[in-house]
Structures are given as C-alpha cells and as structure tokens.
UniProtKB/Swiss-Prot annotation:
Family per record: Belongs to the FKBP-type PPIase family.
GO biological process terms on file: protein refolding
Alphabetized InterPro entries for the sequence: FKBP26_C, FKBP26_IF, PPIase_dom_sf, PPIase_FKBP_dom, SlpA/SlyD-like_ins_sf
Pfam families membership: FKBP26_C, FKBP26_IF, FKBP_C
Chain spans, region CTD: 151-231
Keyword Chaperone listed: yes
Record keywords: Chaperone, Isomerase, Rotamase
Descriptive protein name: Long-type peptidyl-prolyl cis-trans isomerase
Organism name: Methanocaldococcus jannaschii (strain ATCC 43067 / DSM 2661 / JAL-1 / JCM 10045 / NBRC 100440) (Methanococcus jannaschii)
Keyword Cell membrane found: no
Length: 231
C-alpha cells in the first residue's frame, strides 16, 4: 500500500449526479463537454495522506497499491463538505458598488478572497452563497495510482509543476546538498513567479532530507541574427 507522505501520481474522473465534473483525462473532458483549454491534463502528483485531495480520496489512496484502480463514493463530509447555512450572507448592494462589481444572479464573485455565487438581488441587498457549489453533494470518483515517485530529480520536477504547471519540463541537478533548477526564458514573465519560487524551495527542503539549498537559474542566450536582419 502507498505510504503516507510518499509522492504518487494519480489519474481520476469525478462524477456528481451521474455527470462528469472533474477529470485528468483530456479526451474524456472533451467528450463530456467540460474541456478547459487552460487546464493541463494528465496524471497529477500529490503527497499521499497530506490533504492535497479530498479527505475521502486521501483515505482511499492510502489503502491502494501502485497500478490499482478503484471506484469510491464520497459522502459530503469526505468530499466538499456539508452545506453550511452560515455561509449564506446578505450583503448591501453598496458594497458591490464600492468594489466595482455589477451583481447578477448566478454570477460567481470573490469577496475578501472567498468565492461565492449570487443567489438573488432584492431591496438593495444581495444574497450570496459562499458554500462550495458541490457542498452537500455525494460524489463518485474513479481513481488510479499510476506510480510512486521515488527519484529525487523527478520529485523536484513534480513539485515545480505543483506550483507552476507551465513549468512542466525543467532541468534539475542535485549535487553536494544543492538542488539547482534551470528555468526557461519565459519564467520571469509568469505571474507571481517569485512567490512560487519561494514556495517551491520550501517544499523541496521539506521533502528532501539531504537538500540544504535550492537555487533557480535563469539563462538568456544571444539571439542568432537571420540573413534578413543583416540586410
């Protein structure tokens, strides 16, 4: 069985009321009409049993072997939680005006970092539900443990992808306690990259016992001039 804290790569399909709402399978997403071009599909890496997936999935993963596929049905408390009436708030319309938001029924908004859905607008007040949209729902997952990641360089690469999915193929070297990560030229233009680099470094130092230092290398090469440019 998978040990707690081990990095594993998993694939999964999530269903609610018989409809697919989440998947790592690009073709299935397209077939079922939930494809998101901004998503990067394929197996994802997590640290087993550490709360990086739904509680019920975490429990199932710790009971599974590599290569095993399982179907699990999760009650609300082990999925997206029970519906909490206290998370349904009446907010003055003036608050939305102040924030430059035009409230529309059904619109998903974020207030103070918390996402919510507008339920109704009446008499200068807006009813917003801050429960997760799947709160109170039973969900079903098909999950497969694709592999356990043991190689240190691959662990580092997967940690980088966890925080910045666009950095899917960085070069990693590990020598004398230093983990060196070579970033592509476009890396400095990724939003919040400095914060992500700090989080990546902290995660690596936490996971690799013999790592003492993490360095990020950004290399910019001289562009070769074409014959057209030299004319």
């Amino acid at each position: 069985m998978v040990e707690k804290g081990k990095m594993v790569k998993i694939s999964y399909d999530g269903y609610v009321d018989g409809k697919l709402f989440d998947t790592t399978n690009e073709e299935l997403a397209k077939k079922e009409g939930i494809y998101n071009p901004a998503m990067i599909y394929g197996p994802v890496a997590i640290f087993a049993g550490e709360g990086q997936v739904l509680p019920g999935l975490d429990e199932a993963i710790l009971e599974m072997d590599v290569g095993e596929e399982r179907e699990v049905v999760l009650p609300p408390e082990k999925a997206f939680g029970k519906r909490d009436p206290s998370k349904i708030k009446l907010i003055p319309l003036s608050e939305f005006t102040k924030r430059g938001i035009k409230p529309i029924k059904g619109l998903t908004i974020t207030i103070d970092g918390i996402p919510g859905k507008i339920v109704s607008i009446n008499s200068g007040r807006v009813l917003v539900d801050f429960n997760h949209e799947l709160a109170g729902k039973e969900v079903k997952y098909r999950i497969k443990i694709e592999e356990v990641v043991d190689d240190k360089k691959n662990i580092v690469k997967e940690i980088v992808k966890m925080y910045v999915p666009r950095l899917s193929d960085v070069k990693v070297t590990i020598r004398n306690g230093t983990v060196k990560i070579e970033l592509p030229e476009f890396a400095p233009f990724i939003p919040n990259i400095q914060t992500a680099k700090m989080a990546i470094a902290n995660e690596i130092l936490k996971r690799l016992e013999d790592a003492e230092k993490v360095s990020f290398v950004e290399t910019f090469e001289r562009k070769k001039e074409t014959k057209e440019e030299n004319k």
